[in-house]
């Protein structure tokens, strides 16, 4: 998937350069193009000539995603634990029960849980909207270690932000990031999130972010 990630980097740099030249605050256009639209609806598509491998599909969580998601969490457990609290052995022991609860929350409309699914069905990332209420939701994401640092997070968050406004009819997204995670802060800032007040998150100094969609 190296060519895909190189394409993401090139597209992000291109959009950042164009934005700087315009000296305008607009958020760069999404460079992530999903192959399977959320809810079965059509989504904007592009066919960049340099792209020779399929991009990961942005998909809403389904029952049949369970094995791939479990593998994703297991393979990246130590990597994730370096920046966020470890889920603990209990999470994996009770995965089936917890997974069913996630699907129930999504069916109830309180959560929109997205996976980045590569060719072959491998999960390489998650971008979730949780605590959906009154036109607002909390955004959170995690990307596989082998896919980190390549611009995939920025592109995926951009696409979910679009879905939040158009598919889910939300007007505001919230996010929280610890001060020792500058990469995540950059992802949010590239996607139009504005820093708010400081807070404590899992015992660490953190910052709240807001993105107005309307």
Positions of the model-derived regions?
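Acyl-donor (CoA/ACP) binding surface of acyl/acetyltransferases
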Residues: 1-68, 72-79, 113-214
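Generic, well-ordered alpha-helical segments
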Residues: 61, 72, 90-97, 108
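Conserved GNAT-fold acetyl-CoA-binding loop/helix
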Residues: 79-101
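A short helix-loop-beta-strand connector motif used in the catalytic cores of GNAT acetyltransferases and
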Residues: 90, 101-115
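Short alpha-helix boundary/capping motifs
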Residues: 97-101, 108, 167, 192-193
